Amino acid sequence: MKILYLLFAFLFLAFLSEPGNAYKRCHKKGGHCFPKTVICLPPSSDFGKMDCRWKWKCCKKGSVNNAISI
């Protein structure tokens, strides 16, 4: 029975994250995920959280060079 629990846990973790689809919505907007402490310039290039991980946000790729970290 323990083997079944371990097998289920392994399968669950294996399919939990799909690396090919990470941040798909942000990338479709032409953005990239950055920590929330980064300020995107101009402000219109800040798309918000979208599908980025916790405490990260989506900024337009062109604003990467202009990003300011607090």
Swiss-Prot record:
Keywords noted in UniProt: Antimicrobial, Disulfide bond, Ion channel impairing toxin, Myotoxin, Neurotoxin, Potassium channel impairing toxin, Secreted, Signal, Toxin, Voltage-gated potassium channel impairing toxin
Subcellular location: Secreted
GO terms (BP aspect): envenomation resulting in occlusion of the pore of voltage-gated potassium channel in another organism
A Pfam match: Myotoxins
GO cellular component, one term: extracellular region
Cysteine disulfide links: 26-58, 33-52, 40-59
Main location: secreted
Signal peptide start and end residues: 1-22
UniProt-recorded Gene Ontology molecular function terms: potassium channel regulator activity; toxin activity
Domain of life: Eukaryota
Annotated family: Belongs to the crotamine-myotoxin family.
Subunit-level organization: Monomer.
Protein task: Cationic peptide that possesses multiple functions. It acts as a cell-penetrating peptide (CPP), and as a potent voltage-gated potassium channel (Kv) inhibitor. It exhibits antimicrobial activities, hind limb paralysis, and severe muscle necrosis by a non-enzymatic mechanism.
Identification of the protein by name: Myotoxin
Native organism: Crotalus helleri
